[in-house]
């Protein structure tokens, strides 16, 4: 008999159930976690031995959504799930980020976490459920893991924090923040906000961390009941003698190398020092392990940089802790794009473009949570040349998808509504140089490019990356970190926002002991940096341009009676296709009768508007129109009277005398005056040539 072990607890307004012991018993650990009908099955498998020569920790996190979870069959040709969607990739990263720092530094065994969404309630996003499941499975597995962690989503509705808001509640929320951490420390924050203050953002982080303690307590209780024995794994003892010898040979030289401000020159010098030291030590003792020497050199290198910062000495590139690198801001640099900007901060540079399209250019996204249309796209590209390397060029990698999403979060709060600006907007950030915080450079460049394109954004936004070096109670917060400071520091803290508040916050912490005070210092320092960058950006462009590019489509909006939509579309789309070809415009019709006409030429748009007005104009009974014979039948002729309208002239209404044969009087394409005699309930028009040609008949109205 399979006997599951279950923990059930209340988590805000939801009930969470964690179950183990029933499924995937050959995995190292497996749990089924559910929150109000949203269920995620999470497995962990760890290899007992590391691969020989393994130099990094091979942790893989795969989050996958199954369409059966929502009672659907995939719409693809093969009717099965394919490559991960952007949403699945982002959630995989969301799980990876808080768990990765909790494995011991020298643990190099392969670990794979797979989270599969097997049931979904559209009101409950599976990402928090998957995070809880990954934490529970790792804690149960016995793998060396300094967890468990908890996870919470925090909303901000009516000036109150809301724990794990539903999908409907999030639509009313000014904040969507995910926080994960251990009992004593926040490890990861991912959020977007509607221009909230630093205090409100920090309050949300603290609130989420406090509330998730119930998750950690219940996972610990489950581990006590069902946890597997801890692995008999010990970190390799440090070779103190070799460490001292490496430090003696390399420390001073690395200190000098890290005074070289130019990145590539510094890297060349550091690589040369490492090669010299390794060669010298192996020459003295060829039994030494070159990989071990490299690991010790990396440790010495880290200590050199961190010690200088903690002593208050200038940073790698000579700056003080709160200084921003030199900025160069340019707009309108690409002549045929709709908007463009080149944003340079030190050795980080982004070429950003904005392109305007129509509603049919919007992205239709089919997710488990339901279908939606996205009319604002932001894509981030990180080619290998931006860091002076060669490499594969192709579809975006996980990192590019994640950085693009963060940059989009930073800009989203200031974007105009569809009613204010009915365009689909695509921003592309090409990172042409990178030495720290290219995602935040993308935020700055996106703001500039959107303004250059004439998009009426509510405010300019800028982003900044902060870092932290902490030893004991001594800590230093660094503004505008370099790539090396990110790699060698204890925290990566990215903040985007306008002059009035924060629009996005992302935080990844590698150590415990990050207090509210430290986060407060970092947020306040980031605000000063953000305002400085905004000041420089505003010198280049301070408000959106008054008009969009001459190469961008202009969208004109008109409204018709919804009952007339069928007339504009025509049978099988014949009328709207003819209109599009005739006027050279793009025409989109909504169910409420709103028509959007896009054209690069204003005269073409006006022509399309005039033709639609003709088609939708009410036919007046008793009025005489100039018509054209379009079809001849035995009992009469069909005559077009303009605006896509066509009526029947019965054989008895062609002439004053009896007509035996219609073709004796009318030919195809012949212009004839006709009088509207009747429009019946079905919209059919009865015409008369006889009545239109009487001596007292008025002059016909021209058909177009």
Swiss-Prot record:
Residues annotated as signal peptide: none
Reaction it catalyzes: RNA(n+1) + phosphate = RNA(n) + a ribonucleoside 5'-diphosphate
Keywords: Cytoplasm, Magnesium, Metal-binding, Nucleotidyltransferase, RNA-binding, Transferase
Domain KH: 553-612
UniProt record, GO biological process: mRNA catabolic process; RNA processing
EC number: 2.7.7.8
Main subcellular location of this protein, as a coarse class: cytoplasm
The protein's assembly and partners: Component of the RNA degradosome, which is a multiprotein complex involved in RNA processing and mRNA degradation.
Protein family per UniProt: Belongs to the polyribonucleotide nucleotidyltransferase family.
Identification of the protein by name: Polyribonucleotide nucleotidyltransferase
Organism of derivation: Yersinia pseudotuberculosis serotype IB (strain PB1/+)
Taxonomy of the source species: Bacteria, Pseudomonadati, Pseudomonadota, Gammaproteobacteria, Enterobacterales
Gene label: pnp
């Amino acid at each position: 008999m399979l006997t599951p072990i279950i923990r059930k607890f209340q988590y805000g307004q939801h009930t969470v159930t964690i179950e183990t012991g029933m499924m995937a018993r050959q995995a190292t650990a497996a749990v089924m976690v559910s929150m109000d009908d949203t269920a995620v099955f999470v497995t962990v498998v760890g290899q007992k031995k590391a691969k020989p020569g393994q130099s990094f920790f091979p942790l893989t996190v795969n989050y996958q959504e199954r369409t059966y979870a929502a009672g659907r069959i995939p719409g693809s040709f093969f009717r099965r799930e394919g490559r991960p969607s952007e949403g699945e990739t982002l959630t995989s990263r969301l799980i990876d980020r808080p768990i990765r720092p909790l494995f011991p530094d020298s643990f190099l065994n392969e670990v794979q976490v797979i989270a599969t969404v097997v049931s979904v309630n559209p009101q409950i996003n599976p990402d928090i459920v998957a995070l809880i499941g990954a934490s529970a499975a790792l804690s149960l597995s016995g793998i060396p893991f300094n967890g468990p962690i908890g996870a919470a989503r925090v909303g901000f509705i009516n000036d109150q924090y809301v724990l794990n808001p539903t999908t409907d509640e999030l639509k009313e929320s000014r904040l969507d923040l995910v926080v994960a951490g251990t009992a004593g420390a926040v490890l990861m924050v991912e959020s977007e906000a509607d221009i909230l203050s630093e205090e409100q953002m920090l309050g949300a982080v603290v609130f989420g961390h406090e509330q998730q303690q119930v998750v950690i307590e219940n996972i610990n209780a489950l581990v006590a009941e069902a946890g597997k024995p801890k692995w008999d794994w010990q970190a390799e003892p440090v070779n103190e003698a070799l460490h001292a010898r490496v430090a003696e040979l390399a420390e001073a030289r690395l200190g000098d190398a890290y005074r070289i401000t130019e990145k590539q020159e510094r890297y060349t010098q550091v690589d040369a020092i490492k090669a010299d030291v390794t060669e010298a030590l192996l020459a003295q003792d060829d039994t030494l392990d070159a990989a071990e020497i490299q690991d010790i050199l990396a440790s010495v290198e880290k200590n050199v940089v961190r010690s200088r910062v903690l002593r208050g000495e200038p940073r790698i590139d000579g700056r003080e802790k709160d200084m921003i690198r030199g900025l160069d801001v340019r707009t309108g640099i690409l002549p045929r794009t709709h908007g463009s900007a080149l944003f340079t901060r030190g050795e980080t540079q982004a070429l950003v473009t904005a392109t305007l399209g129509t509603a049919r250019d919007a992205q239709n996204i089919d997710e488990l949570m339901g279908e939606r249309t996205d009319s604002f796209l932001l894509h981030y590209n990180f080619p290998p040349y931006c860091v002076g390397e060669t490499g594969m060029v192709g579809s975006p990698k996980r990192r590019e998808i994640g950085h693009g999403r963060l940059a989009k979060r930073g800009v989203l709060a200031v974007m105009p509504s569809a009613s204010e600006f009915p365009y689909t907007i695509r921003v592309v950030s090409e990172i042409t140089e990178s030495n720290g915080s290219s995602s935040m450079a993308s935020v700055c460049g996106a703001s500039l490019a959107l303004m250059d394109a004439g998009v009426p954004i509510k405010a300019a936004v800028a982003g900044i990356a902060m870092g932290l070096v902490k030893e004991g109670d001594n800590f230093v917060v660094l503004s505008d970190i370099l790539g090396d400071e990110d790699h060698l520091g204890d925290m990566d803290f990215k903040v985007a926002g306008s002059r009035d508040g924060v629009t996005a916050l992302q935080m990844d912490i590698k150590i415990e002991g990050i207090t509210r005070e430290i986060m407060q210092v970092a947020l306040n320092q980031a605000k000063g940096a953000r305002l400085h960058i905004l000041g420089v950006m505003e010198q280049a462009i301070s408000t959106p341009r008054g008009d969009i590019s001459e190469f961008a489509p202009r969208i004109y909006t008109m409204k018709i009676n919804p009952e007339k939509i069928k007339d504009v579309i025509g049978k099988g789309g014949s009328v709207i296709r003819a209109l599009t070809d005739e006027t050279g415009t793009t025409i989109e019709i909504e169910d409420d009768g709103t028509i959007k006409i896009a054209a690069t030429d204003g005269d073409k748009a006006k022509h399309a508007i005039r033709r639609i007005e003709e088609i939708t104009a009410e036919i007046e009974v008793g009025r005489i129109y100039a018509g054209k014979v379009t079809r001849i039948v035995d009992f009469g002729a069909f005559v077009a009277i303009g605006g896509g309208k066509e009526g029947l002239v019965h054989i008895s209404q062609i002439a004053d005398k009896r007509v035996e044969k219609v073709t004796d009087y009318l030919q195809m394409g012949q212009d004839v005056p006709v009088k509207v005699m009747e429009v019946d309930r079905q919209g059919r028009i009865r015409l008369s040539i006889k009545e239109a040609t009487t001596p007292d008949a008025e002059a016909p109205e021209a058909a177009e």
